[in-house]
From Swiss-Prot:
Binding site for Mg(2+) 1: D190, E194
Function: Involved in the biosynthesis of branched-chain amino acids (BCAA). Catalyzes an alkyl-migration followed by a ketol-acid reduction of (S)-2-acetolactate (S2AL) to yield (R)-2,3-dihydroxy-isovalerate. In the isomerase reaction, S2AL is rearranged via a Mg-dependent methyl migration to produce 3-hydroxy-3-methyl-2-ketobutyrate (HMKB). In the reductase reaction, this 2-ketoacid undergoes a metal-dependent reduction by NADPH to yield (R)-2,3-dihydroxy-isovalerate.
Primary gene name: ilvC
Binding residue positions for Mg(2+) 2: D190, E226, E230
Catalytic activity, EC: 1.1.1.86
Organism: Methanospirillum hungatei JF-1 (strain ATCC 27890 / DSM 864 / NBRC 100397 / JF-1)
Protein name per its UniProtKB record: Ketol-acid reductoisomerase (NADP(+))
Length: 331
């Protein structure tokens, strides 16, 4: 079982005298930086000029270019997209990452797959909130927190875990729970979850169900409501109480269909595909494919994204959501 940590296990004094540079001010960067600042820690923001620069300044941060932030900071937390981190590290961070500093991540991709190779005289740690940046911020302001993972890749100082736990406390994660894992385990399980279940698996399952009903002559609106709109209702029940709560909340007819038909949809063929996907992650084949895709301006990524944006389910979804009051204020 994974080790668990809470507020009582974390001491903010481990980083209270240090300067933390948050590189990036997107969803995670903004959420983490604001929480750290509100926890009384010294935070600077490393960015290139643009809207995020102006936003960070307006929210009370000292903002500078990435290279200067890396030089000035004791702890450097990289919170820009995975595919950008390697180049930014080499050109703007590495020179300022001097002996005794701490390099941080919220996802292990670039360390685990060798896109970033830090010097041997720095600590390399991870604090990975298990929720988007706006949720990290919102729960903090409510006096709660989002669970997080910590991992230690290099612990030259001997204080890597203390630093990670203190940072996790600074963003509010120890108010919930913090689990200790490894860079390898976090990276591989995170990618697998995204590809096979949460994003890739779910969207493909929904599209297949939608297409099956539409091709059989059912109204696209009915297909959308049955295979996409109601997904949230079921997922929320599973999230709150596992499969048991979900099954206790649906009809006996639905539960019988779930138990007898579900394994026919996700059967041996799907299981074998999941094993293959996991192997591609473990061997680095997926990481290589993704890095190469970015080097040639993402032709596959862009084509597949456009195709899904033009799918009938998206058109129908926009029309249906426009009729529902709960979606009026959502962007």
């Amino acid at each position: 079982m994974l080790e668990k940590y809470y507020d009582k296990d974390a001491d903010m004094s481990a980083i209270s005298s240090k300067t933390i540079a948050v590189i990036g001010y997107g969803s995670q960067g903004r959420g983490q930086a604001l929480n750290l600042k509100d926890s009384g820690l010294k935070v600077i923001i490393g960015l290139r000029p643009g809207k995020s620069w102006d936003l960070a300044k307006s929210e009370g941060f000292e903002v500078m270019d990435v290279a200067n932030a890396a030089k000035k900071a004791d702890i450097i937390q990289i919170l820009i997209p995975d595919e950008q981190q390697g180049a930014v590290y080499k050109t703007q961070i590495a020179q300022g990452l001097t002996k005794g500093k701490t390099l941080m991540f919220s996802h292990g991709f670039n360390i685990h797959f060798g896109q970033i190779v830090p010097p041997a005289d720095v600590d390399v740690i991870m604090v990975a909130p298990k929720g988007p940046g706006h949720m990290v911020r919102r729960t903090y302001t409510e006096g709660k927190g989002v669970p997080a993972l910590i991992a230690i890749h290099q612990d030259v100082s001997g204080n890597g875990k203390k630093t990670a736990l203190a940072y996790a406390k600074g963003i509010g994660a120890t108010r919930a729970v913090v689990f200790e894992t490894s860079f390898r385990e976090e990276t591989e399980t995170d990618l697998f979850g995204e590809q096979a279940v949460l994003c890739g698996g779910m969207t493909s399952l929904i599209k297949a169900g939608f297409e099956t009903l539409v091709e059989a002559g059912y109204a696209p609106e009915m297909a959308y409501l049955e295979v996409l709109h109601e997904t949230k209702l079921i997922v929320d029940l599973i999230y709150e109480g596992g499969f048991t709560k979900m099954r206790n909340s649906i009809s006996n007819t639905a539960q019988f269909g779930d138990l007898t038909r579900g394994p026919r949809v996700i059967g041996q063929e799907s299981y074998l595909a999941m094993q293959e996907i996991l192997e591609e992650i473990q061997t680095g084949a997926f990481a290589k494919e993704w890095m190469l895709e970015n080097m040639v301006n993402r032709p596959v990524f862009n084509a597949l994204t456009r195709a899904d944006e033009e799918h009938l389910i998206e058109e129908v979804g926009k029309e249906i959501r426009a009729t529902m009051p709960q979606f009026k204020d959502l962007k």
